Amino acid sequence: MVSLPYAAALAPPVHSLSSPVLLPGSAQLVIVAGGGRDLTWPPGLIASHLLRASAGRLVQALLHGAARGADQAIASAADQLGWLQISCPAAWKQHGRAAGPIRNRQMLERSLELLADLPLGAGLLVIAFPGSRGTASLL
């Protein structure tokens, strides 16, 4: 006969929303992703690339530019993966042609704010899918 404390020690841990699992920082990640408006990859292919790039780490948030093309596919992929996504649309009327690069800088700044709330060692991953010159300002 196995004593209850020993049996309980062998049982897998039970976690609920009221008792979150704390992961080491190195296991957590924030992703900023973007690409061109003409990108026609299906969301499943984008999701595959995102999963491979995240390498099994827990993605706390994925930021994208909320534009047509790559950003729409990135948003759909994040939904498929169950990841929190943060849409960051450009303010075209306010900034004109500079709106895209300004938005990209704001996404990077926001991702650093998110990282500051995570344990030491959490990572930032910037992914640029095929795109235009505007995508380059994300890097």
Predicted feature locations:
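Acidic/glycine-enriched connector segments
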Residues: 2-139
